[in-house]
């Protein structure tokens, strides 16, 4: 908090229930509702170039609402243990106060508003020396803001690119009005869903000195899902073979990290 920025605050209410169904599984369910105030978001059109204005002048304060319900089922039978978790959630932001308006004062989804989350985990112990594990996770994509439309400003000066021809005989030049991007609403785009499968096996053994050592062999993202790390706008240029005119269209491209990654780990306890 500063002299201009108030401390963030929140109130959360939750209620839950637990039930054990003998010889089948343990079940739990919990619902929550959370209100938040004095949240910070960058203003529409805020520029990050230069330091002519203080960061406090580039942000707005607003409120948020989040609510959801969580389910969990667990079971242990023999040497196998597993659980399944599912969460349905929603998180919105509202910036409608005078001087702090974002998105025309209309409600918009938070960046990490993920509607669905699923976690499935299982472990099996073959013996005191060997155990295996598997885990699968899924979540809906995060929200992001992109400008899908452009327009030419009426009052912007046109500039002319000199006429010229390249070595292939293509002609260039003409008037080009200044264009501006138009964002329909805040966080108007969703990343693709995130999911992956991880597998692992542990080999345990006691050393002659009585220390426990473990070899772990794991595979992260077994089926090499290309989950989005971030998405960016790319200008795609194509040429019409008949008119020999170039046309530029904006497309979205996805950058990914961490495809399938095998690993080996050695641990000794002493």
Task: Give each language-model segment a name.
Residues 9-13, 63-67, 114-118, 193-197, ...:
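Residues that define the transmembrane beta-barrel architecture of outer-membrane proteins
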Residues 3-5, 17, 57-61, 70-72, ...:
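Outer-membrane beta-barrel proteins
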Residues 32-35, 53-148:
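Gram-negative outer-membrane beta-barrel transporters
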Residues 1, 40-48, 89, 94-103, ...:
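Outer-membrane beta-barrel translocator domains and adjoining extracellular loop/strand segments
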Residues 37, 129, 138-177, 192-196, ...:
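C-terminal beta-signal and adjacent terminal beta-strands/loops
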Residues 4-56, 65:
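Membrane-embedded beta-barrel scaffold of Gram-negative outer-membrane proteins
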């Amino acid at each position: 908090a500063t002299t201009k920025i108030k401390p963030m605050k929140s109130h959360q209410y939750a209620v839950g229930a637990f039930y054990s169904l003998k010889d089948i599984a343990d079940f739990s369910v919990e619902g929550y509702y959370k209100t938040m105030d004095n949240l910070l978001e960058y203003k529409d059109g805020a520029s990050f170039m230069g330091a002519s204005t203080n960061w406090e002048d580039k942000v707005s304060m607003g409120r948020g609402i989040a609510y959801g319900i969580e389910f969990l089922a667990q079971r242990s039978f023999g040497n196998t243990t597993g659980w399944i978790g599912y969460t349905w959630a929603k998180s919105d932001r509202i910036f409608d106060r005078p001087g702090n308006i974002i998105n025309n004062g209309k409600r918009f989804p938070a960046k990490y508003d993920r509607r669905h989350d699923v976690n499935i985990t299982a472990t099996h112990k073959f013996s005191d020396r060997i155990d295996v594990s598997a885990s699968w996770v899924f979540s809906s994509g995060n929200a992001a803001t992109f400008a899908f439309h452009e327009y030419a400003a009426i009052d912007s000066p046109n500039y002319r690119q000199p006429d010229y021809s390249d070595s292939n005989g293509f002609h260039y030049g003409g008037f080009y009005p200044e264009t501006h991007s138009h964002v329909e609403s805040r966080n108007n785009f969703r990343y693709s869903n995130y999911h992956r499968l991880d597998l692992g096996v542990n080999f345990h053994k006691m050393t002659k000195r009585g220390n426990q050592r473990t070899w772990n062999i794991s595979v992260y993202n077994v089926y090499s899902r290309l989950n989005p790390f971030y998405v960016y706008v790319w200008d795609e240029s194509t040429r019409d073979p008949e008119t020999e005119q170039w046309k530029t269209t904006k497309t979205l491209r996805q950058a990914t990290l961490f495809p399938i990654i095998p690993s080996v780990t050695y641990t000794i306890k002493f």
